[in-house]
């Protein structure tokens, strides 16, 4: 029974649940993440409204198109701003039955290449049977006047793809999966997507980025998979290991802890989880090593492989001779000093000598200690010998800074390895090594174990390799502690530079970074400086001052562009002073108007600064890359982002790979350097306040560092040098193997 829609109603009637029907006239708003939808609906003649009269329908549904018939359950309400509307608790959309509805439906953008004119011709030809013809007799499209073969094939393909997607969307709506995620599922599994997911929902966690255990588990329990199912137990084991890798950076977990955490997650008995673990071991999805009080070390197979292969790659390079005549280091250093017009410090000379005589060496130290000088010297000396020098860094910003400071071309490690989308692997690998004689890598503290594996697989055995980095910064975002493990192993020659060169009488950025690293108080001077501390006691005041400095005070005083030159850094994503809220508020202040594409609660506008959240090899864009929105299309909810001037298109389903980046976490800023940074440090961030976090933040600023927050929080961070050790075995793997002397000869 369909309820009438009265012109006025009492409060009591507004509270009653009713059912309304109609035809979608327009989709005013639709959020692909949570399904929130605002529709303009034409009421049918059976309603007490006049025929054709429209009303506003608000509720949650998945994909919806103009012309569809809609049925909704809910209540009539009066919104203070938008007036009378129907607030639905359930919305069901079905394909239209009337000729007018079908024509509007086809012209809504549902079918690629079909607009109003062509939709009219198709419906004129087939009438009320149009949708049946498209589904079951698409060959009859030849009967439509002036419709060529190519267009017919385009319509057929688009229609059948949408049928698959519509079935998937209905499934997604039932189990609370967003349109964007369902689109990715269909893209991954094809026309059998729903059947595949029903058979094993947990494969979603493994196959698709952005879909976690909670979503897969909800689907699994809803389709009848038992709570103590081996399928569920195995998924819990994998998810627990993946969570520890991605959130804590661990490469392995103790067996007892793993089973305990998986039990806490699922309430599955430990005995069943233990059996599931053994099955995962048999199928080589996980690997076990060693024994101890806490049980075996359990690795996800890819992380175990990454550690093993990285160690193997290092041994291969250390154990292989160079193909060129050995360099006389003393003469080479003297030659370079005469050319440069100054003498190196003793520790710099030591670092340079090691890098000229050892196959693989490491140079570490904080800001201003002369690391770049050594890179420049190495490049000059090796180039003078006619050798090919390759400079690379983990991120685009780090590579650009390396090129500018050294005066030679540099690239990202991903572009050095060159992803091949056809083979779905890097072009340069163990079978096809990179071309070059000397490979120098900067900002290596950012390199995680997976990237290290790919890198060392692709380096030629004869290569000379130099890693440069700062072990006192935060470790890599991804799992592992590669630079630290290399040094810890003692298998690779490492030199630590500690004398500060890059400072003058007025510069406090470098000085304060070293103060923090030594556990000492900050220096703050009145008057002109490159380092300031602004006290803000409560989070609201801290937010207000951040916006004030970002939008007016820094641009006015220092002439810096807030969009391109100033970066806000904060320890966390959540809370008032987390990146999510900061980006929302800073966007309102810096880029408040213009056409926008919506994803979840985020608006993307032309001019917005955005960051990529994952490696997307097909787009040649990588985790942490920063770009600017160049164009938006509200019609298909796509946008174009310029990364270093290169345009990259994002479809609606890809938008979850992007976030606004007016503010970013300190960890995400690693490897980048900005003309100015605003660092928020408050007791709201208490659990994150650590020395290496503050040190990393301060070393991101080149010309200006502005600290906003509470003195107690600053002191807490400086004094808290307790760093959680990452569970890795790379150092052990390097120590346990046959030792080499670093010059290409093995020692027994």
How would you describe each model-predicted region?
Residues 2-331, 748:
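Accessory, non-ATPase domains that flank or precede helicase/AAA+ motor cores in DNA-metabolism machines
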Residues 341-357:
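N-terminal pre-P-loop "Q-motif" helix
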Residues 371:
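Conserved lysine of the Walker
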Residues 363, 391:
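Hydrophobic anchor at the beta1->P-loop junction of P-loop NTPases
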Residues 625-748:
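C-terminal accessory regions
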Residues 377, 381, 385-387, 393-405, ...:
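Conserved helicase motor core of SF1/SF2 NTP-dependent helicases
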Residues 368:
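Walker A (P-loop) phosphate-binding loop of P-loop NTPases
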């Amino acid at each position: 029974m369909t309820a009438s829609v009265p012109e006025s109603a009492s409060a009591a009637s507004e509270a009653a649940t009713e059912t309304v029907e109609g035809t979608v006239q327009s989709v005013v708003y639709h959020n692909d993440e949570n399904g929130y939808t605002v529709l303009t609906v034409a009421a049918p003649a059976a309603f007490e409204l006049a025929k054709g009269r429209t009303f506003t329908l608000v509720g949650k549904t998945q994909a919806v198109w103009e012309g569809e018939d809609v049925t909704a359950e809910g209540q009539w309400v009066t919104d203070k701003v938008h007036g009378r509307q129907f607030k639905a608790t359930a919305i069901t959309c079905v394909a239209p039955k009337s000729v007018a509805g079908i024509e509007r439906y086809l012209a809504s953008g549902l079918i690629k290449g079909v607009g109003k004119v062509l939709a009219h011709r198709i419906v004129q030809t087939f009438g009320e049977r149009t949708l049946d013809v498209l589904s079951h007799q698409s060959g009859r499209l030849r009967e439509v006047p002036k419709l060529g073969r190519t267009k017919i094939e385009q319509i057929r393909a688009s229609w059948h793809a949408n049928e698959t997607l519509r079935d998937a969307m209905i499934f997604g709506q039932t189990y609370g999966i967003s349109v964007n995620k369902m689109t990715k599922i269909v893209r991954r599994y094809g026309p059998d997507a729903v059947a595949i997911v029903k058979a094993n929902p947990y494969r979603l966690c493994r196959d698709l980025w952005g879909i976690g255990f909670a979503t897969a588990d909800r689907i699994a329990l809803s389709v009848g998979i038992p709570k103590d199912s081996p399928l569920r137990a195995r998924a819990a084991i994998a998810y627990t290991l993946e969570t520890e890798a991605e959130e804590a950076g661990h490469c392995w977990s103790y067996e007892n802890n793993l089973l305990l955490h998986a039990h806490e997650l699922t309430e599955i008995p430990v005995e069943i989880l233990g059996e599931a673990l053994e099955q995962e071991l048999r199928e080589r999805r996980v690997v076990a090593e060693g024994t101890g009080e806490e049980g075996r070390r359990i690795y996800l197979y890819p992380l175990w492989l990454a550690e093993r292969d990285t160690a193997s790659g290092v041994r291969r390079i250390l154990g292989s001779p160079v193909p060129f005549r050995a360099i006389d280091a003393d003469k080479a250093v003297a030659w370079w000093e005469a050319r440069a017009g100054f003498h190196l410090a003793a520790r710099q000379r030591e670092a340079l000598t090691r890098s000229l005589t050892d196959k693989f060496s490491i140079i570490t130290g904080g800001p201003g200690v002369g690391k770049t000088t050594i890179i420049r010297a190495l490049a000059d000396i090796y180039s003078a010998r006619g050798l090919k020098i390759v400079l690379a860094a983990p991120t685009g910003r780090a590579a650009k800074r390396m090129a500018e400071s050294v005066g030679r071309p540099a690239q990202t490690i991903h572009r050095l390895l060159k992803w091949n989308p056809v083979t779905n692997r890097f072009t340069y690998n163990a079978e096809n090594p990179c071309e070059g004689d000397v490979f120098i890598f900067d900002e290596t503290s950012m390199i995680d174990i997976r990237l290290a594996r790919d890198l060392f697989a692709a380096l030629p055995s004869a290569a000379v390799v130099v890693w440069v980095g700062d072990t006192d910064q935060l470790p890599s975002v991804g799992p592992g502690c590669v630079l630290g493990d290399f040094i810890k192993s003692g298998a690779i020659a490492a030199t630590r530079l500690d004398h500060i060169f890059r400072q003058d009488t007025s510069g406090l950025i470098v000085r304060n970074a070293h103060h923090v690293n030594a556990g000492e108080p900050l220096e703050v001077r009145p008057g002109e400086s490159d380092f300031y501390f602004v006290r803000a006691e409560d989070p609201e005041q801290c937010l207000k001052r951040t916006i004030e400095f970002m939008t007016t005070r820094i641009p006015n005083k220092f002439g810096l562009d807030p969009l391109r030159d100033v970066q806000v850094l904060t320890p966390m994503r959540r809370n008032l002073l987390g990146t999510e809220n900061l980006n929302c508020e800073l966007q309102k202040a810096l880029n408040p108007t213009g056409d926008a594409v919506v994803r979840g609660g985020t608006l993307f506008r032309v001019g917005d600064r955005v960051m990529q959240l994952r490696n997307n090899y097909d787009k040649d864009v990588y985790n942490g890359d920063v770009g600017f929105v160049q164009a938006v299309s509200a019609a298909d909810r796509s946008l174009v982002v310029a990364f270093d001037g290169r345009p990259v298109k994002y479809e609606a389903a890809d938008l979850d790979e992007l976030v606004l980046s007016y503010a970013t976490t300190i960890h995400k800023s690693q490897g980048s350097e900005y003309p100015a940074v605003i660092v928020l440090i408050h007791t709201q961030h208490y659990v994150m306040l650590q020395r290496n976090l503050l040190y990393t933040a301060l070393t991101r600023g080149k010309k200006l560092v502005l600290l906003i927050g509470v003195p107690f929080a600053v002191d807490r961070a400086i004094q808290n040098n307790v760093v959680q050790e990452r569970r890795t075995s790379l150092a052990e793997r390097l120590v346990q193997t046959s030792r080499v002397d670093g010059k290409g000869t093995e020692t027994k």
